[in-house]
């Protein structure tokens, strides 16, 4: 019973739509009706500016950190995997917004930061380099998501961490399908483009 409650808690934690809340509170706008319509920090940055985006980013990052801490505290590697993936699923399919949320990148980053700070550092450098040279946040997100399980495996992380990396990569890439199509045809918005 206690384990089930923790799993529900992790999903609900992931479901807290910080991008929506901060945009609504500070700009009185509905992020779902602005820019790409995505409930994530990148869309907040492009539509509401860096200040609001930073708050949204930190909120989503914190969700991942807390979910990883909860999962780790159970002492079970299986429960850890389920807890953190439920948090990411909660972010993507939030009960509080009719199951239409973000793409799971920042919440995943919070989880990896808690579990594997060394891997996070490597992937962050790669992400920043890609975004700096291409101005495509989506390309950076997709690339580091794909690299996550490979880097985790190469650095000898526990099997549960590698599984988490594989599942996160699958979720992130799947929910970037439209971005991938736009990258291919050259219509993807850059971080410097205003919505």
Swiss-Prot record:
Transmembrane regions listed in the UniProt entry: 3-23, 51-71, 79-99, 111-131, 153-173
Family: Belongs to the PlsY family.
UniProt function note: Catalyzes the transfer of an acyl group from acyl-phosphate (acyl-PO(4)) to glycerol-3-phosphate (G3P) to form lysophosphatidic acid (LPA). This enzyme utilizes acyl-phosphate as fatty acyl donor, but not acyl-CoA or acyl-ACP.
Lineage: Bacteria, Bacillati, Bacillota, Clostridia, Eubacteriales
EC number(s) given by UniProt: 2.3.1.275
Name of the protein: Glycerol-3-phosphate acyltransferase
Main location per the UniProt record: membrane
InterPro entries hit by this protein: G3P_acylTferase_PlsY
Gene name of this polypeptide: plsY
Entries under Pfam families matching the protein: G3P_acyltransf
Membrane topology: Multi-pass membrane protein
Gene Ontology biological process: phospholipid biosynthetic process
One of the record's GO molecular function terms: acyl-phosphate glycerol-3-phosphate acyltransferase activity
């Amino acid at each position: 019973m206690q384990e089930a409650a923790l799993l529900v808690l992790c999903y609900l934690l992931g479901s807290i739509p910080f991008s929506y809340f901060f945009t609504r509170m500070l700009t009185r706008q509905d992020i779902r009706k602005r820019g790409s319509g995505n409930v994530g920090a990148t869309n907040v940055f492009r539509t509401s500016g860096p200040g609001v985006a930073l708050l949204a980013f930190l909120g989503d990052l914190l969700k991942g950190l807390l979910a990883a801490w909860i999962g780790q505290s159970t002492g079970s590697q299986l429960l850890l995997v389920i807890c953190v993936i439920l948090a990411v699923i909660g972010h993507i399919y939030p009960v509080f917004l009719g199951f239409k949320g973000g793409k799971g990148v920042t919440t995943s980053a919070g989880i990896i930061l808690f579990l594997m700070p060394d891997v996070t550092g490597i992937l962050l450098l790669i992400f920043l380099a890609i975004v700096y040279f291409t101005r495509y946040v989506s390309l950076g997100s997709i690339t580091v998501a794909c690299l996550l399980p490979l880097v985790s495996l190469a650095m000898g992380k526990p099997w549960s961490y590698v599984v988490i990396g594989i599942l996160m990569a699958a979720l992130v890439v799947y929910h970037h399908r439209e971005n991938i199509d736009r990258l291919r045809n050259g219509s993807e918005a850059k971080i410097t483009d205003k919505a």
